[in-house]
Regions:
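Generic N-terminal initiation segments characterized by hydrophobic and/or small/turn-forming residues
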Residues: 6-10, 65, 204, 214
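Charge-rich, solvent-exposed alpha-helical interaction surfaces
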Residues: 47-50, 63-65, 119, 123, ...
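Contiguous, amphipathic alpha-helical segments that mediate oligomerization or scaffolding
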Residues: 21-66
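Surface-exposed polar/charged interaction patches
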Residues: 28, 54, 58, 126-130, ...
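N-terminal, Lys/Arg- and Ser/Thr-rich interaction peptides
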Residues: 2-29
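Hydrophobic-cavity lipid-handling domains and compact docking modules
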Residues: 69-172
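Glycine-rich, aromatic-bearing surface loops/beta-hairpins
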Residues: 141-218
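Alpha-helix boundary/N-cap detector
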Residues: 13-16, 28, 32-35, 39, ...
Length: 218
């Protein structure tokens, strides 16, 4: 799993400032004592499980491009291998939806020097990309497979009454965590996460920004 503080290799694919931060906390109002996170997480898990069950055959078609700075664009054409994994400890309803962006064409890059080769290779591995290396006396070559492992994790911060949504390699390479007040984890937000995964629709970012602005005014 890549470090949350690793800078993404890709350029920002959205024009939203929220997509350029590694962690964003949306301030919360006082949560009602009777409100619990379990129903919210349960609905999110059911929605993600339904996606995983329906997306297997045939695979979902989606053209995506991951811009690798200094290398080129890694292109994929489908979403495959969806799965839902529950967090084992603590068993608080947290879970992860994992999947893969899959394509057909490898991305080949000849490095200008051994130093560049080593730095690029490390950063590619940090993002869990599948990389083959070919070295000779005169050149070092990176062959990047058209496969990007991605995940969306839903978890809990009970000490602050927050739900956390972590996107890893979704739309762009890198990991970003959104900490949201419990009441923000509603049907619209959950559906927007699914739309972000399956269509790259950016409603999720807009809802997150709207939630932050609403609480600043409140």
């Amino acid at each position: 799993m890549p470090d949350d503080n690793t800078e993404p290799l890709t350029i920002d694919l959205t024009d939203n400032p929220i997509s350029r931060v590694q962690s964003r906390v949306i301030p919360s109002r006082v949560v009602r004592p009777t409100e619990t996170i379990e129903p919210h997480l349960a609905h999110a898990r059911r929605t993600c499980a339904a996606l995983a069950a329906s997306a297997g055959n045939p695979p979902l078609k989606l053209k995506a491009e991951f811009d690798l700075v200094g290398i080129g664009r890694l292109r994929t054409t489908s979403l495959e291998n969806f799965a839902v994994q529950d967090q084992q400890e603590p068993k608080d309803g947290s879970f992860t939806l994992s999947f893969e962006y899959c394509g057909r064409e490898q991305l080949i890059h000849v490095c200008a020097s051994e130093a560049v080769y080593g730095a690029l290779r490390k950063r590619l591995f940090d993002h869990e990309l599948t990389v083959k290396s070919v070295s000779s006396a005169t050149a070092s070559k990176l062959i990047i497979e058209p496969l990007v492992s991605a995940a969306v994790s839903f978890s809990v911060d009970r000490t602050r009454d927050l739900a956390r949504i972590t996107l890893r390699n979704v739309v762009m390479l890198g990991t970003t965590t959104y900490a949201l007040p419990l009441e923000c984890l509603d049907r619209n937000l959950i559906d927007s996460v699914v739309e972000l995964v399956t269509t790259q629709e950016r409603t999720f970012y807009a809802l997150s920004i709207a939630a932050a602005q609403h609480r600043k005014l409140g």
